[in-house]
């Protein structure tokens, strides 16, 4: 094998795979993810309008 014959055997870009084939487990997982995302968004909105949870008052230095 000479130097010119060597090289990459695989093409740089792989053909795209069809991701449209999903079974029941995949569908259930996607649905669960959507529900968790909605719950997270609702929790973010609820937390954003609340304000600070705990105020420690005036912070004091360690010196006495």
From Swiss-Prot:
Q: Which InterPro entries match?
A: TMA7
UniProt feature, compositional bias: Basic and acidic residues: 27-44
Q: Which Pfam families match?
A: TMA7
Q: From the UniProt annotation, give the residues forming the signal peptide.
A: none
Q: Which residues form a coiled coil?
A: 21-50
Which key words are in the record? Coiled coil
**Where is the stretch described as Disordered?**
1-64
Protein family = Belongs to the TMA7 family.
Cite the PANTHER family for this sequence: TRANSLATION MACHINERY-ASSOCIATED PROTEIN 7 (PTHR28632)
Q: What is this protein called?
A: Translation machinery-associated protein 7 homolog
